Swiss-Prot record:
Any single GO BP term: DNA repair
Keywords from the UniProt entry: ATP-binding, DNA damage, DNA repair, DNA-binding, Helicase, Hydrolase, Isomerase, Nucleotide-binding
Protein's recorded name: ATP-dependent DNA helicase Hel308
Complex formation: Monomer.
Enzyme class, UniProt record, top EC level: isomerase
Function: DNA-dependent ATPase and 3'-5' DNA helicase that may be involved in repair of stalled replication forks.
Region annotated Disordered, chain positions: 706-729
PROSITE patterns: HELICASE_ATP_BIND_1, HELICASE_CTER
Domain Helicase ATP-binding: 33-199
Amino acid sequence: MKIESLDLPDEVKQFYLNSGIMELYPPQAEAVEKGLLEGRNLLAAIPTASGKTLLAELAMLKSILAGGKALYIVPLRALASEKFRRFREFSELGIRVGISTGDYDLRDEGLGVNDIIVATSEKTDSLLRNETVWMQEISVVVADEVHLIDSPDRGPTLEVTLAKLRKMNPSCQILALSATVGNADELAVWLEAELVVSEWRPTELLEGVFFNGTFYCKDREKTVEQSTKDEAVNLALDTLKKDGQCLVFESSRKNCMAFAKKAASTVKKTLSAEDRNALAGIADEILENSETDTSTNLAVCIRSGTAFHHAGLTTPLRELVEDGFRAGRIKLISSTPTLAAGLNLPARRVIIRNYRRYSSEDGMQPIPVLEYKQMAGRAGRPRLDPYGEAVLVAKSYKEFVFLFENYIEANAEDIWSKLGTENALRTHVLSTISNGFARTYDELMDFLEATFFAFQYSNFGLSTVVNECLNFLRQEGMLEKDDALIPTSFGKLVSRLYIDPLSAARIAKGLKGAKSLSELTLLHLVCSTPDMRLLYMRSHDYQDINDYVMAHASEFVKVPSPFDTTEYEWFLGEVKTSLLLLDWIHEKSENEICLKFGTGEGDIHSIADIAEWIMHVTSQLAGLLDLKGAREAAELEKRIHYGAAPELIDLLNIRGIGRVRARKLYEAGFKSSAELAEVDPEKVAALLGPKIADRIFKQIRGRGTSSGIIASEPPEKSPYSGQKTISDY
């Protein structure tokens, strides 16, 4: 099907022709035939790199140029940024694009001036909770990676959000983009959508198992030269010799870092002089962005043409790795499943070096087929590679047979709603009542019966869980005590602040029960909520943290009995996370924190993001309920954002000054932005360097605000910086 033949405005067709897209892929053509451009709901369950995003673009542009507005929902911030960059190319068509992923207690009415809004599912949910007016103008909703409705962490929010959007705008077109799953037909029926299912790919995908020096596919086999003792290194070298690139998936951060180091010396021998120069530049940028041991190791790997990628790296470091790989300079990335989660980063060959992953409940377990398919889908760059290869590495003949039967020849699992538990449902029950989607019990049940959970389970057990949620919300004062579903001011604020009602209840009880409110008291209160992401306890942590608890017992609202092993161990994890935050706000270096707590720089920022948000909630709840702690929590919120002591906050409002530079200025006697404005710039240049000093004084003495500086952009207070189960690896 030719682009020129589509029922689209001429300027849209010309845009794609100018981009070199003349013809649709077969699955795209099928989608058009099934009503994509006629406003029909559609579920596309097709492989990675088969053109799902183009389907979304065509539907959005058709609707927008007819006066509509589009909402593009993604599961991850990184994916939101990637789509935002792509959609900004539509500016030549007069299309305005906005993005929003944080600040969950804002209505963001300003976003409504845009034609395409890119947002995470959590942000979309918060916009609905805050009754954002422009949401009623949405004519097309795109749900990217909709198979993640199966995720215990993020699936319920995506599911309820889609149900609310369909209820609010019954005529709105829903376009759901999914990996190939076992029950796509069931998902399509729930969405009242046409279904496009296909295994077609623009580049051939060869899936197989590597064993004893040979890559075995279904209908062919290929011998690989054994240049080293590591089979995955040999597979990578084989690809590099043919001008390809490799993604290697590992089961843990430790393993992916170790493999990048192991492969470095071999990969380095394949680099051209031009590659080496470019890689040296990337390595220098890595070191400019971070001074931790991990970033130093990453820079060493990058100079040799390899890299590692996991959620322990900060976003700037991950982006430098991704950009270096896209540019063809980095030849091999060793990654945890972060790169399988929707980002557009394909390679000639994908190597799954370990098909098992650790679970705290069950130990090492095989990954789902769906996750394998997501990894395998990264193989083969459209228009660049003649083919793609997805390779599982077997260590024995028994494992070889297992991998072939359970992955290569297997179909992806069915996806199942995870909404049917009190933990998943209580926040959505409160929000549904608070923003008027349901005013009576019958209306609440009618709404919930429109969810995927009710569709799959025929309402089995739903009323029982709903009643448990309602009893909890009434007991905690978030709903009025009578049978009518009327939210209290407490309940409305909890819903608007986008916090789990259980977290809000714990915060309120903690503030009431605390004898005093030290930094540790408030930090631990935040870390005791279910919204918080906790650090793992290592075997040698227990004694140290237990000793700390004994020495500071009076600063905790409640210390559980050590004889209740499960509860006490969880409590120690809360304390460990609190101590990380305590070091953070007292300006310990990131490298020192990483080494002390056995974590990554990216984890520090992720934990601080979540803690900042919950501390913001704590301040707001204390103010509403007239409890002590509102002022203290508000100050700690700022300190967590910057990772600094209170005396540095004024300096940290200047863009370009971080916690380290602010401390240098303060110790040199420049203790506020007002004092800094009166200083000879040469003195600051001697302290921070001429470039930084120039930027600072342009703000202070140039386009300043009424206070004399340009304040940094407000923090994105988001409890969802990463995706659990995948991005936390």
